[in-house]
Amino acid sequence: MIKKSAAILAGGKSSRMNYRNKAFLKYEEDYFIERIIKALEDYEEIIIISNNPGEYKEFGLKVFKDIYPGQGPLSGIHSALNHIKNDYCLVVACDMPFINKDVVNYLGNIKEDYEILIPKFQERLQPLCAIYKKSCKDIMEKELINNSNKLIKTCFKFSMKVVEEFPFIEKVHKKEIKNFYNINTVDEYEDLIKKKEI
């Protein structure tokens, strides 16, 4: 058991997805959110952040709303950090159907000498599959109050540990390499369903 919390950001309906809730898109018979919950099962606590908590009753998890709604993923992370019981929280977006248990467990077991542990994949930081220290919530709140809600910009206000290598990644199924892929548009989702791979 990983003595950290995990939070799934299920912000709601996306305009680029024709206002469908991406958490309830299906891939291989499971909702995206079901696949993510399974990947996070070794974390001591799993919560969901959503402004529509009634939609998630079937999963038996605690659901919390944004404290500062309408300000994007930074608001969701801030809410998660205010509600978790542990000192660290893995944050995952609900539109990442290939989140892999080995990858998130590897992140969860890295020594806690950081405020933010953030993967870098294909030259891009991945703040929506990253671990945040609970104490980050105070600076995040100041940013939200000032309507300065850019997530990456806010991340640079903290001591970040960047993870660029996953030692096991070449030895396992290629789905691990897709871990950070997210589905944003109707076309991307239709392509996913047609090809069954990315």
From Swiss-Prot:
GTP binds at residues 9-11, 22, 66, 95. Mg(2+) binds at residue 95. Its cofactor is Mg(2+). Its main location: cytoplasm. Keywords: Cytoplasm, GTP-binding, Magnesium, Metal-binding, Molybdenum cofactor biosynthesis, Nucleotide-binding, Transferase. The keyword Transmembrane helix does not apply. It is an enzyme of class 2 (transferase). GO terms for molecular function: GTP binding; metal ion binding; molybdenum cofactor guanylyltransferase activity. It comes from the Bacteria. Coiled coil: none annotated. One of its GO terms (biological process) is Mo-molybdopterin cofactor biosynthetic process. It is found in: Cytoplasm. Belongs to the MobA family. The N-terminal domain determines nucleotide recognition and specific binding, while the C-terminal domain determines the specific binding to the target protein. PANTHER family: MOLYBDENUM COFACTOR GUANYLYLTRANSFERASE. This is Probable molybdenum cofactor guanylyltransferase.
